[in-house]
Structure formats: C-alpha cells, structure tokens
Amino acid sequence: MEQTWRWYGPNDPVSLDDICQAGATGIVNALHHIPNGEVWSKEEILKRKAIIEEKGLTWSVVESVPVHEEIKTQTGNFQQWIDNYKQTLRNLAECGIDTVCYNFMPVLDWTRTDLEFEMPDGSKALRFDQIAFAAFELHILKRPGAEADYSEAEQAQALEYFNNMSEAQIQQLTSNIIAGLPGAEEGYTLEEFQAQLDRYAGISKDKLREHMAYFLSQLMPVCEAHGLKLAVHPDDPPRPILGLPRIVSTIEDIDWLTEKVPSKMNGLTMCTGSYGVRGDNDLVKMIKKHGERIYFTHLRSTKREESNPMTFHEAAHLDGDVDMYNVVMAILDEEQRRAEVGDHRLIPMRPDHGHQMLDDLKKKTNPGYSAIGRLKGLAEVRGLEMALKRAFYTK
C-alpha cells in the first residue's frame, strides 16, 4: 500500500515536514479555499502541487472535490455545477493527479456527537451517541417526523438526556453536528440546516440513486478520456439519518453502483471505519468482491457500544470491530492480483483519524486529525503490512 496522509493545506497544524517524519510519501489534499461548485483552475492546482512536491512528497489523491447540493437534488443550476465538476477533473488530470475521492451524502458529511470522548487511557476519540443525536433531532432541531426514526425507549432516553443538558452542552452538541467537521465544506445555523433538510423532501433513496447515476454518467467520458479514477466514500455513519436517504452504505449499494455505472473509472474508497460501523457489513467480502474498483483506502476501526447498537466510538486502529489483519490481507491480495496483470501501482492508504493523545492533548487540532494518533495508526498498519508481506507474499 502507498502510505499517505491527509493534509488540510497551509493552515493545517500538522505541517508537511511533520508528515515527512511520519514516513508517509503521499499527500491527500483538497483546495478547501475554493467555494463548492467553482472550477479548480490549473493555476491553483499547480500552486498547491508545487508546495507538496517541494517537500519530496506526492499529491496522490484529491479528497474531496465537493459535490454541490443542487447536483444531489437536481435543482437550480445543477447542470452548470456538473459542467464545472467535469472541468475540475480535466484540470486535475492534466496536472498529473488521477485519483479523486468524493461523497454523495446529502447535507452533512461525516457526523459525530462528541469530539472529545475520553478513552480509558486518557486519550480522546470521536463518538456517535445515538441518544444524544436523538436529543438533538427531537428537542433541539425539532425535526418534523423525527419520532418515527426512534423507538419509544430511545425517545424516553433522549428526553431525559436533553433535560439534563446545560445551555453550553446544547450549543456544543449542535455545533458538533451542524457546524462542519474537517473535510466538510458547509456549516449551518439551525434554521439554515432545517432549510437544507427540507430541500430533500420527496427525494427517496431510489430518486437519490437516479441523481447519482446521472451525475456519474456525465463524468465518465471525462474520466475515461483522461484516465482519472473516481473513488466514492461511503456514508458516515452508513445509514439514513435526519430523514435523509443514504445510498453508499452496504455491499448492496456498491453492487448497484457498479452495475448501474460499469465504467472502471467509477471506483470506491474502502473506508473501514465507515462501512465497519454496521455489523452486517463484511469488509473482507466487500474487498474481495469489488477489489478491482478500490482506488483508495481509509484504514481505521470503530467499536459499537453495548448501550445501543447505533452508538459507536472510534477505536485504536488495530482494536475495535474491524478485523484489520484480514482487511489488510485482502487489500494486499488485490495489489498482488493487479501486479500479476502488469499494474504495479500501490493502492493509496491513509490512517484515517486517530486519537488525540500525548502532547496533542495540549494543542488545538482538527477533530480526528491530530498528528500523534495518526502517526501511531500509520506505524501499526505499516508493521502489520510488513509482517503479512514477509509471511505470505515474499517469493
């Protein structure tokens, strides 16, 4: 696997020099300063590429080129936004970048309720608490119809949870959910947030699938002409939330996506931390079945909690519910399969998220993207990969 690291650009507290010391060789980056929908010019792409290459690193993957909300709803200027997206892809390819991660999650990117969940060892992790989220939906946002998404027991627990919250805790929970996490391009007020949700009224899972298929059908000719691979990131968490449909959550969703848009340029990001939240997602099976479409991997683990099957926290990279040993083995199997047919390029992998620990506990960091936790994760995955290669792949 190609060892990569997500970098949020010149304002990231983790510098490119830090990343070099971590042992990564590839950078995962995006032009976050360009508003959603606008074309990324070659000038801006090359400017960022030069900064990365000056340190001896490679801009391996774009994560992400954001998909404008009007593309997802097929309203307003959606065709113009698609045309802009196509031009951005052309520009990236012509600047030598050929792998683009994106997602098709409505309104929100990845979602957590707690950004400082304390682990037994004192480090801090990200957490999604189903009851806290229910309290937000039912009693803070007061989304119409939200009751249908929760059991009577969950509703009672959510009310108790809400009644015990201080005003500061209400503000913090609201901010955690709607203010935009790292990599998300939008932040909202409560009123703006509900207005965004309302735009999806009447858009079912099947309808959102239609919109995604149309979007990809427009992009594939550009991707095929330039050899540019798209790698869709799964929903996080991988299930419907806030009354919104989710369409990249299961192996059945991947089956549909690859059958509907069969071009090999229509690929996947295997994010084990997102897919792995669901106990019914067999990650190794997913990799073995759709390995040829996997162009990017995010390796991390989550732990489902006993209090509620929908509640989870981000575990250490080799702990939790993800069988990282067999996941990495399956990825290495796919790399070997490719090498046997002449494709020796390694699959880009980044240690996704990491616990805030040690000296980083005293620093301001991007949630999930502190340096030391990811350094630990990268080292662990690197060691696992080396052991597997020595044991099973050395001829």
UniProtKB/Swiss-Prot annotation:
Origin superkingdom: Bacteria
EC number annotated for this UniProt entry: 4.2.1.8
Keyword Iron: yes
Listed pathway(s): Carbohydrate metabolism; pentose and glucuronate interconversion
Reaction catalysis annotation: D-mannonate = 2-dehydro-3-deoxy-D-gluconate + H2O
BP-aspect Gene Ontology terms: D-glucuronate catabolic process
Cofactor(s) named in the record: Fe(2+); Mn(2+)
Pfam family, one: UxuA
Keywords carried by this UniProt record: Iron, Lyase, Manganese
GO molecular function: ferrous iron binding; manganese ion binding; mannonate dehydratase activity
PANTHER family, per database record: MANNONATE DEHYDRATASE
NCBIfam families: PRK03906.1 (NF003027), uxuA (TIGR00695)
Function: Catalyzes the dehydration of D-mannonate.
Membership in a protein family: Belongs to the mannonate dehydratase family.
Protein's name in the database: Mannonate dehydratase
Taxonomic path: Bacteria, Pseudomonadati, Pseudomonadota, Gammaproteobacteria, Vibrionales
Gene: uxuA
